[in-house]
């Protein structure tokens, strides 16, 4: 196989959304699987809606997801001269023509066709008139009037369009700017793109683009159209389904590898395997396993998967990842070694970094700033519970050395010597140390806090 070149071509009229990100992931994986190239094009010809802030956001989102691209991004807004060269060639070769029909006249033609039960389209009035350029005139491609345009879609199989139903599409607008389909064809050809993966809302553009490739004598890439992502109600995914822009998922504490894994599984499968490393995805990815059916977005499954990735992240790496989220709540300067242990203690139940940062607060806060849950205090800090805490305080203070292992031994000995069950001492100790009934292993918590802070918290609980 010759070198595979894929592309991702977002429009900077908004932030990168999940559908676009999935397309980018599929295209990136296909290129990396074959050791090819993945190129990036910014389709910014809509001058009114395109904004630099969206371009920056898209590039940042791609980088965060780990989707590196080859070469520099190509910007359509800087290539108008190139597009016009190709349009002028089509005009010179008689494969395109000038048209003076107004939008109102074209709409009237379409209405007439509808009334006759025909495909609504431009009727070719200017096709053979030999007009020259002039104010208000557009350039149209001479599409074949008979036959079919057929291509083998990498996802959907063979797709055929009757040429009689295709328009003589506009390739240059009256203001001199190229249209979407013309620009895309010129770009993909000059960028060496061999495979185009995109959403199936582009299927109807494909025959038009194939006709342009053929008219220009350019090699036609392979096309694959993936079904859209649906919400739980089987409607097109939108914000009302809980979907966010990619940059928002970063800010809410998702790990990029979890989001990439989840997006890949929305439309691609490899047996029953759910979780993949990036290297596994590159090795196993194939367009043969892309689904023809639309996939449903499940935010709860995404959170579950992210939790799996959090638990597998080494504690020191996780500490670095969660630190920016702690900084937002005033805990950004925590000692690295302390934070590493704390992250390891709390990661088992966290689904995202925001949740992890919030859960860690009881061990990060100052001892005199620990917040107590009133119901937990009432339930656990009874006279009996306070008695156990007082006795345990004496035992902890008397230890020659103090760490998590020592704390565990003291607890075990106290329970055994007094004929107790752990549930008699666990809840009051947990409330004293963490302010609530839930949390990680108590011995590990005391090892993290150290003797001085453990005793300080026991003293504060005794004074409640």
Curated annotation (Swiss-Prot):
Pfam family of the protein (one): tRNA-synt_1c
Binding site for ATP: 239
EC identifiers of the protein: 6.1.1.17
Motif residue range(s): 'HIGH' region: 10-20
Stored InterPro entries: aa-tRNA-synth_I_cd-bd (IPR045462), aa-tRNA-synth_I_codon-bd_sub2 (IPR020751), aa-tRNA-synth_I_CS (IPR001412), aa_tRNA-synth_I_cd-bd_sf (IPR008925), Glu-tRNA-ligase_bac/mito (IPR004527), Glu-tRNA-synth_I_codon-bd_sub1 (IPR020752), Glu/Gln-tRNA-synth (IPR000924), Glu/Gln-tRNA-synth_Ib_cat-dom (IPR020058)
Binding site for Zn(2+): 99, 101, 126, 128
Keywords per UniProt: Aminoacyl-tRNA synthetase, ATP-binding, Cytoplasm, Ligase, Metal-binding, Nucleotide-binding, Protein biosynthesis, Zinc
Cofactor needs: Zn(2+)
Cofactor info, note text: Binds 1 zinc ion per subunit.
Compartments in which it is found: Cytoplasm
Gene3D superfamilies, sorted: 1.10.10.350, Glutamate-tRNA synthetase, class I, anticodon-binding domain 1, HUPs
One GO BP annotation of this record: glutamyl-tRNA aminoacylation
GO MF term list: ATP binding; glutamate-tRNA ligase activity; tRNA binding; zinc ion binding
GO cellular component, one term: cytosol
SUPFAM superfamilies: An anticodon-binding domain of class I aminoacyl-tRNA synthetases, Nucleotidylyl transferase
Catalytically driven reaction(s): tRNA(Glu) + L-glutamate + ATP = L-glutamyl-tRNA(Glu) + AMP + diphosphate
UniProt main location, coarse: cytoplasm
Sequence motif: 'KMSKS' region, positions: 236-240
Parts forming coiled coils: none
Function: Catalyzes the attachment of glutamate to tRNA(Glu) in a two-step reaction: glutamate is first activated by ATP to form Glu-AMP and then transferred to the acceptor end of tRNA(Glu).
Family the UniProt entry places it in: Belongs to the class-I aminoacyl-tRNA synthetase family. Glutamate--tRNA ligase type 1 subfamily.
NCBIfam families: gltX_bact, PRK05710.1-3
Assembly and oligomerization: Monomer.
Protein name: Glutamate--tRNA ligase
């Amino acid at each position: 196989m010759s070198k595979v070149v894929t592309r991702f071509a977002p429009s900077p009229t908004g932030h990168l959304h999940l559908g676009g990100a999935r397309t980018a992931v599929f295209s990136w994986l296909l290129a990396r699987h074959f050791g090819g190239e993945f190129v990036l094009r910014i389709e910014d010809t809509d001058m009114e809606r395109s904004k630099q802030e969206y371009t920056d956001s898209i590039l940042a989102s791609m980088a965060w997801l780990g989707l590196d691209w080859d070469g520099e991004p190509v910007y359509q807004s800087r290539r108008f001269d190139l597009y016009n060269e190709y349009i002028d060639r089509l005009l010179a070769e008689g494969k395109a023509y000038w048209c003076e029909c107004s939008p109102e006249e074209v709409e009237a033609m379409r209405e007439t066709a509808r009334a006759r039960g025909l495909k609504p389209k431009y009727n070719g009035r200017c096709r053979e008139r030999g007009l020259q350029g002039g104010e208000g005139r557009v350039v149209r491609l001479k599409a074949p009037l008979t036959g079919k345009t057929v291509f083998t879609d990498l996802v959907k199989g063979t797709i055929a369009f009757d040429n009689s139903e295709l328009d003589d599409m506009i390739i240059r607008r009256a203001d001199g700017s190229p249209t979407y389909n013309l620009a895309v064809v010129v770009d993909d050809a000059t960028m060496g793109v061999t495979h185009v993966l995109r959403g199936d809302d582009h299927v109807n553009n494909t025959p038009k683009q194939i006709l342009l490739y053929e008219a220009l004598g350019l090699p036609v890439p392979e096309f694959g159209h993936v079904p859209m992502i649906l919400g739980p109600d089987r409607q097109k995914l939108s914000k009302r389904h809980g979907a966010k822009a990619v940059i928002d998922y970063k800010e809410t504490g998702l790990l990029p590898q979890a989001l990439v894994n989840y997006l890949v599984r929305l439309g691609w499968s490899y047996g029953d395997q759910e979780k993949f490393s990036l290297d596994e995805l590159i090795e196993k990815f194939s367009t043969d396993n892309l689904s023809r059916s639309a996939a449903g977005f499940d935010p709860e499954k995404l959170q579950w998967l992210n939790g799996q990735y959090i638990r597998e992240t080494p504690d020191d790496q996780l500490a670095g990842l969660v630190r920016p989220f702690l900084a937002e709540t005033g805990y950004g300067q925590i000692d690295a070694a302390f934070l590493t242990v704390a992250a390891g203690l709390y990661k088992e139940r966290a689904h995202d970094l925001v949740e992890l940062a919030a859960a860690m607060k009881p061990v990060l806060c100052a001892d005199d700033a620990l917040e107590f849950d009133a119901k937990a205090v009432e339930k656990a800090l009874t006279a009996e519970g306070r008695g156990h805490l007082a006795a345990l305080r004496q035992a902890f203070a008397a230890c020659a050395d103090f760490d998590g292992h020592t704390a565990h031994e003291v607890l075990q000995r106290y329970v055994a010597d007094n004929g107790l069950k752990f549930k008699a001492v666990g809840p009051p100790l947990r409330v004293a140390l963490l302010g609530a009934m839930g949390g990680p292993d108590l011995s590990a918590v005391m090892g993290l806090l150290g003797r001085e802070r453990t005793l300080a918290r026991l003293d504060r609980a005794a004074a409640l």
